[in-house]
């Protein structure tokens, strides 16, 4: 809720400066799989999402989308860009092969960065931004 409130505040501040400018809010994408989330490290080497499950991360993204939809639905010329539900989060991240556990020779593909997609993910996000722009530009006049 706090993140959504900050986004709504940005919209409010833009509106103070220009009451009619179209505002596009690109919704947060879903992160990679559990192994990517569970092993992603911050710059200092500590785990970024220690103890968190993909379902928790997904729920947070889902709730943020719903909250923004509720809070911004009455705003004129504010458009939500559904990047989260339009990007293939299962296949859009850079991966590397890792052993499934320290005692196994079996490997699996694990996301290197669970938050930021590979170029193909950004292309998918760009496509949905472009589609949203094309679908709403007629309302600008």
Give, region by region, the residue ranges found by the protein language model.
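Histidine-centered active-site loop/cap adjacent to the catalytic His
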Residues: 102-141
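Substrate-gating cap/lid alpha-helix
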Residues: 31-85, 119-123
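Solvent-exposed loop/turn segments at secondary-structure junctions
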Residues: 1, 28-33, 84-90, 115-116
